[in-house]
Amino acid sequence: MDSNNSNNNNKNLKQICDIPKPQFLSKGVFTLVGVLCKFWISMNTVTTSGIDKLVNEIDKTHQLKRPMITIANHSSNLDDPLLWGVLPNRILMDPSKQRWTLGASNILFTNWFYSKFFSLGKCIKIVRGDGIYQDGMNESIDRLSEGQWLHIFPEGRISQQTQLLYFKWGLGRLVGECYRRTGVVPLVVPIYHQGMEKSMPLAKLPIPRVGINLDIKVGDNIYCDQVISKYIDDNKISDLTDYLSQDDKKRKDFYKTITLHIEDEYQKIIPPTNRGRFSHPTIKD
């Protein structure tokens, strides 16, 4: 399995949807939001680690059309886009290089204007409670299968506790289904940040505060090739398709196994005092 080069699969992909239409409006949205993010970042004390590595992976994804998923802890409603203010302008304000991300329907898609604005900002609507097979998840897999960058918050909701919530199995579905479609395992890049919970505490008005200490760390790449290889022989994608077609429990077991692997690797970038997570729910027959 190849998680670094998807060029051999590009000819089998549909036309890539990398900039929402109308494109000039999408470019306007990213420019406006990018300027605001840069301004907000400048008003805080920011410490970063590994940003150059993240920029390099974003460039590779854009050039090689190699699927990439960035994951981060979720501390406030504005983690995305504010945290991207540390990226260079050539990425931050270029919608063709920017991430796709998931947005809650009850927050970002509550009226026509919000829906249009956030769609132009490459947000994909997710309905909380509709599970891992909903339309928004399918669209996210489409974007990954085109070799694009997708950013998600795998906890699935905001948490300002010191320890993480367990990662939702939808993360495993994104990785597994992208491989099943394309033969390429998405690269997973972990990001951990501290300070956003002080900028936007849940009990107060949802206005980003300034003058905070913000720390953003990009960890080592997470590879899922070995996990997926346990389900197939000689890189035969048909083996995986046959396995996943048997029943929903086997599918969820596959997705959960990938998710647990990513979860374990993600723990490595978290300060020891903040490590730990809640247990996962049991897979039912």
From Swiss-Prot:
GO-annotated biological processes: cardiolipin acyl-chain remodeling; inner mitochondrial membrane organization
Give the enzyme's EC designation. 2.3.1.-
Q: What is its main location?
A: mitochondrion
Membrane-inserted regions that do not cross the membrane:
24-42
Please tell me the species this chain comes from.
Dictyostelium discoideum (Social amoeba)
**GO cellular component annotations, sorted alphabetically?**
mitochondrial inner membrane; mitochondrial membrane; mitochondrial outer membrane; mitochondrion
Name the keywords, alphabetized.
Acyltransferase, Lipid metabolism, Membrane, Mitochondrion, Mitochondrion inner membrane, Mitochondrion outer membrane, Transferase
Tell me where it resides: Mitochondrion outer membrane; Mitochondrion inner membrane
At the top level, the lineage of the source is: Eukaryota
Write down what this protein is called: Taffazin
